Amino acid sequence: GDVYKRQGLKEVFRDVSAITDYNGTLELTFVGYHFDEEAKYSVAECKARDVTYAVPLRVTARLNNTETGEIKESEVFMGDFPKMTDSGTFVINGAERVIVSQLVRSPGIYYGIAHDKLGKKLYSSTVIPNRGAWLEYETDSNDVFYVRVDRTRKVPITVLIRALGIGTNAEIVDLFGEEPKILASFTKDTAESYQEGLLELYKKIRPGEPLAVDSAESLINSMFFDPRRYDLAKVGRYKFNKKLMLKNRIAGCILAEDAVSQLTGEIVAEKGTKITRELADKIQNNAVPYLWVEGEDEERNIKIL
C-alpha cells in the first residue's frame, strides 16, 4: 500500500498530466499530492456507521494560461483514498474486504496449446497490456500464423509485421529467417508492402471506414506507440521478460548501452559490461524493457526484448 501511495499515484498523475483544453490555451498539471495524517473515523467507527475507512487525498494543481503567461496554483480535495487496516483489509461502506488479484486478466503474456482433429498441436499466445489493445496469436492446421488485434478478425501475422514497418517478404525473411510458419503465412497474405499491410490491418480494425494510409498510420501509431494508449506496465514487462526467459538469452552478451531498471529508473549495468548469470537474473527481475548488446559484427548492435 505504501509503495503505491508513494510511487503508483505519482505515476498516475504523471500519465494524465498535462490536461489541455481544445484550443491548447489552458494547461492543467498536477505538481504534488499528500494525504491527511488521520482518517475521519476509526476502523470500528467505520463499521458502525457503514462508511469507508479512508483518508482525504489533496492534490496541488497548477493552471497555466499559455496565451497570457498567467499561472495559478492551488490545493484541491481530490477525494477519499481507501486506507488499508493493520490486518491487511479494507473497510468499504462498513464491510471489511480483501483484494484478490485476478490473475487471468493480469498484464503479461499467456500461452496455450490445443489439438486439431488429427491431433496436431495448435499453439496460441495472448499479450495482455495494462492498458491498450490485446494481441492474440494462434496457428492453424496448415501452420499459418495468425494474429487478432483487439479482439477483431484474425489476419496473417505478416500483415501486422508489414504494418509495423517491415514491408516486403524479403525484409521479413531477413529478420525472421525462413521460419516455416512465416513462410506459410505468406500464402494467406495478399499484401506485399508496408502500405498494403497497413490498409489490410486497418480494414479489420475499422471495418467499413474509408481506406487511407494516413488514417491507418495514425491508428497503428496511437494503438502501439503512444504510452498513454498502450502500456504493459512494470508488472506486465516483468512477467513478459520472465516468460520469454530473457536472462537465458542475454547471459554472456556484452552491453552496448546501459541497462536501466523500469522499476526505479536506476542503471542496473553499465555499457561494456559482460552479462554474467547473476547479472542476467538481476536485469530480468528489474523489468528492463529491452537491451542493446554488441553483435558479432562490431558495427552492428542487437536489440533484445
Model-assigned labels for residue ranges:
Residues 1-305:
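N-terminal non-catalytic structural scaffold regions of very large proteins
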